[in-house]
Each structure stands twice: as C-alpha cells, then as structure tokens.
A protein has these predicted regions:
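Conserved RecA-like ASCE P-loop NTPase motor core of nucleic-acid helicases/translocases
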Residues: 1, 11, 167-175, 202
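Conserved helix-turn-beta segment of the N-terminal RecA-like "Helicase ATP-binding" lobe
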Residues: 1-26, 190-191
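Conserved helicase ATPase core of P-loop NTP-dependent helicases/translocases
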Residues: 18-34, 196-243
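Conserved RecA-like ASCE ATPase "motif II neighborhood" in helicase/translocase motors
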Residues: 28-77, 239-241
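A short beta-strand element within the Helicase C-terminal
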Residues: 56-62, 235-239, 245-259
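Post-DEXD/H (motif II) to motif III coupling segment of the RecA-like Helicase ATP-binding lobe
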Residues: 67-130
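Conserved interdomain linker/interface between the two RecA-like ATPase lobes of SF2 helicase motors
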Residues: 113-180, 185
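Conserved helicase motor "Helicase C" RecA-like lobe of SF1/SF2 P-loop NTPases
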Residues: 176-203
Length: 259
C-alpha cells in the first residue's frame, strides 16, 4: 500500500527543495491548509519544540538516533509527543539510561515505553549486517614552534590516507571550526587533489560543499550516493560528531577520527 497524496514539510534550518519553516505559526497554517492530505514532517531535535508550539495534532512520530532525545534541551518536547501522539517509536543503537530521577533516561517507561525489539551487536556482526571494524592507531606528534594545529591535522590525515590506500574515506572532526581550518587554511585540499581525491563536507554552519563549490543538500546526497556506488571514484567526506550519525555513506572503506 502506497500513500500518493502526502504533503511534505521540513522543520529545520537546512536547505531543501520542499517547503521549510521553523516558525510555529506557519507550521500551523501549513497543516490546516493540507488537512485533507496525509502530512509528513521532517524535523530535528533542535526544532522539535516548534512543532509542539504549533499545536498541530501528530498521529505517529519516529525518533531516530533516539539517545539524543534524553538531552535536557530536547526531553521536554520528547515527553510531550510521547504523551500526545497516538503512536511513538524510538530507534537507537546506543540507548542512554539514567539512575537518577533528576536526569532523563530511556529507561523511563512513562515516556519511552517498553522495549519492542533489541538485537545484540555481536549477533548483527555474526549474521553479516554489521562489519567488525579493524582499528589502526596512529601516534600524534607535538606541535612545533609557531605551527598551527590545522597544519598538523592536515599532515596526519594525508599520511593516514596514504597508509590506508582506500578510495572512500570519512573523516570525523570534533567541530565545524576544525573542518573549516583544515580545508581553508592548510594544503589538505591540494594534497587530496594531487592524489586524485575529491572532497565533500556538510555542516549546519557551512552548508553542503563539494570540491569547494556550495551545493544544495539534495545535490550533496545525490553525489554522495553516486560516488559511493562508483568503485573507481576517490573521495573524502568531512563531518563532525562521532561516526557522522545520520549519514549513510555507501561504499565507505575507512573512518579517520580527527581529535
């Protein structure tokens, strides 16, 4: 069964070809105008409270990477929809529990309910759904006099890429600033180009960028998908936060943690 009359709204600050707003009044108006249609709303934990403030009715809500929902800034909206939506589901590979009543945890059954399904990671590995990682450790060196941290980061990332000899690499940085410094203030990009690599980055502050050119969010993920399926294409994806939650990089061969 397929729904062919769904209207789509995005409630976040990212770029999209669909109608997008973070104003609660506009969310309410949009919902009323499309009352005869099925409505699909995409939002972030940062903007979830805007939907709550709009006062619209939500039938079903899915919380992806739901361990984030226990954060102090997000929990109030999470609790609200848990109690007001007709169906509420939480998905995470890393559930966060709490042993104190002053800090929210996913073991709070009044909000999160009971566990419907839980699969141990070793079982997923054994059945081939998850590939076990092969960890390689690279020792860092101390900064030389007057040397910029970004220059050392660039040297280490290029050395690691050379040693790995992989075509598709994800680099996880600790902040957007670290990514910007690496790309804008070092020889990192030119060193990649010399080796035949393209580069991509996407953050809420910089937007989506491919080889120095700003593109839309949709273009970014279309290219990411195409390059991921091309066995001969060499590229590096830069993103912040561990393992770049929410990004599906097809064909990914290695992850470098820039710390």
């Amino acid at each position: 069964e397929f729904i062919d009359n769904a209207e789509v709204l995005h409630v976040h600050s990212g770029e999209t070809r669909h109608y997008s707003t973070t104003e609660s009044s506009r969310i309410s108006v949009w919902s009323a105008k499309n009352a005869v249609s099925n409505q699909i709303i995409f939002t972030t934990y940062h903007s979830l409270h805007r939907i709550q403030e709009s006062g619209i009715h939500v039938d079903t809500i899915y919380f992806d990477e739901a361990h984030n929902s226990v954060q102090k800034n997000f929990y109030q909206s999470t609790e609200y929809f848990s109690h007001h939506a007709e169906r509420c589901y939480f998905f995470t590979a890393t559930p966060k529990h709490s042993r104190t009543p002053s800090k929210a945890g996913m073991n709070w059954t009044k909000t999160y309910g009971q566990v419907i399904c839980q699969v141990p990671a070793p079982k997923l590995v054994n059945q081939g759904y998850i590939l076990p990682p092969k960890v390689e450790v690279y020792k860092t060196r101390i900064l030389e006099k007057d040397e910029l941290v970004a220059d050392r980061d660039s040297e280490q990332m290029i050395d690691a890429i050379d040693n790995l000899k992989k075509n598709k690499v994800l680099i996880c940085a600790k902040s957007t600033k670290q990514i910007v410094n690496l790309v804008s203030h070092t020889k990192f990009v030119s060193e990649l180009a010399w080796r035949g690599y393209s580069y991509m980055l996407i953050t809420s502050k910089t937007g989506a960028i491919i080889d120095g050119e700003k593109v839309t969010r949709e273009e970014f993920f279309d290219v990411l998908n195409a390059w991921g399926q091309d066995p001969d294409k060499r590229f590096v994806v830069l993103h912040h936060s561990i393992l770049s939650e929410g990004m599906n990089v097809k064909g990914l061969e290695a992850v470098l943690f820039m710390r």
